């Protein structure tokens, strides 16, 4: 365990600026995070660069605008951590007498040495990789060589990377043209893109953990989401005791996504096997591949309102109404709208004089 894991180191650097005056304010920050995972080597890494911008400004006494936005770019490299056959599983069950390395081929377990000799002679079933580094080959247990293999070999059998970009935020506008009235328009949004790539070549760890095939997969996902809301509030007091509050508005939500993925595997699938060719674009014409695409779109629309009347802060009545419609591609046209009215009444007994005088 001590050889397979490293102390986790994390770096975080931030720069922030802020300012303002009697008409507005702003805040901006830039942040970088680099995190090495617990697995030794460079196969377990997380990087993120992000920025935040918040600002609001009163253009006129009756108009305020603002924006809150964040942007981030991230990338990861990871190893299998859960389940039977993962590198962590091998780390936990491998006997403690097995060294990390075989420094010479003569130290190899017999079954692995036999496959190694076949590769050297050109008679193996595939051009197997035998994992190791400048210190030697990663060792398997000699006591049961067909059981769990070296966790270091399982760590290195696959090259997997992920990355993406996300921008999200809210823009808003508040109008107050006369006393008691406020109109708000607000747009929330999220734009995202992510991609993944994985590659493995024929390898031999032991009789159970091996593959004669090259395998490659890649995927990309793009999406955008937005919610546009408009609503007005009006509050007025008449003759000091009659309070009326009204609100009406609408909300529209749209969500779009597009996912593309592809994979291929076989004994000889690529035009070449140098690092620059380890992508689906360089598949041979007769290579068996699988490509899928699953775009999606949904939308919803809502109208809502509320009316409240109260007398002397003691008696009140409230009426609410909301109508929601969902995308006709998800619901039939006759069932796409839902209507939700409600009415309530209230009595604030603590504001009654006869209770105040006796409690």
Model regions: which residues?
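Transmembrane beta-strand segments that form the barrel wall of outer-membrane beta-barrel proteins
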Residues: 32-36, 317-329, 349
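Outer-membrane beta-barrel channels and translocator barrels
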Residues: 10, 21-22, 58-60, 176-178, ...
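Surface-exposed loop/interface segments of Gram-negative outer-membrane beta-barrel transport/assembly proteins
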Residues: 1, 38-44, 52-166, 184-301, ...
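Predominantly transmembrane beta-strands of Gram-negative outer membrane beta-barrel pores used
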Residues: 4-5, 12-40, 50-58, 66, ...
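Residues on the lipid-exposed face of transmembrane beta-strands in outer-membrane beta-barrel proteins
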Residues: 15-21, 53-57, 169-175, 230-234, ...
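Glycine/serine-rich loop-strand microenvironments at binding/catalytic pocket rims
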Residues: 173-191, 197-198, 300-327
């Amino acid at each position: 365990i001590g050889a397979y894991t490293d102390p986790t180191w994390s770096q975080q650097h931030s720069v922030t600026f802020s300012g303002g005056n009697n008409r507005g304010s702003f805040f901006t920050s830039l942040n970088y995070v680099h995190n090495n995972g617990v697995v030794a080597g460079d196969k377990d890494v997380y990087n993120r660069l992000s920025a935040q911008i918040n600002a609001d400004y009163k253009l006129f006494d009756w108009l305020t605008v603002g924006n809150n936005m964040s942007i981030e770019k991230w990338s990861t490299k990871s190893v299998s951590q859960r389940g039977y056959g993962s590198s962590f599983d091998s780390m936990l069950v491998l006997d403690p007498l097995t060294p990390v390395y075989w420094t010479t081929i003569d130290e190899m377990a017999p079954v692995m040495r036999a496959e190694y000799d076949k590769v050297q002679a050109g008679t193996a079933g595939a051009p197997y990789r035998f994992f190791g580094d400048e210190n030697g080959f990663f060792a398997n247990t000699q006591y049961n060589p067909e059981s769990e293999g070296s966790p270091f070999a399982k760590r290195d059998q696959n090259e997997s990377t992920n990355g993406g970009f996300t921008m999200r935020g809210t823009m808003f506008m508040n109008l107050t043209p006369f006393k008691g009235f406020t109109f708000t328009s607000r747009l929330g949004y999220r734009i995202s893109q992510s991609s993944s790539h994985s590659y493995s070549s024929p390898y031999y760890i032991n009789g159970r953990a091996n593959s004669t095939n090259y395998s490659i997969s890649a995927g990309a996902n793009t999406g955008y989401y937005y919610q546009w809301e408009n609503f007005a509030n009006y509050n007025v007091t008449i003759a000091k005791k009659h309070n009326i509050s009204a609100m009406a508005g609408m909300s529209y939500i749209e969500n779009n996504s597009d996912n593309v993925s592809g994979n291929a595997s076989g004994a000889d699938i690529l035009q070449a096997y140098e690092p620059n060719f380890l992508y689906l674009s360089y598949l041979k014409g007769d290579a068996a591949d699988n490509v899928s695409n699953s775009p999606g779109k949904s939308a919803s629309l809502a109208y809502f309102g509320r009316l409240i009347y109260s007398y002397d802060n003691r008696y009140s009545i409230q009426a609410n109404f909301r109508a929601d419609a969902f995308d006709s591609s998800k619901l039939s046209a006759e069932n796409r709208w839902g209507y939700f009215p409600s009415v309530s009444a209230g009595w604030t007994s603590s504001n009654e004089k006869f209770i105040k005088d006796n409690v």
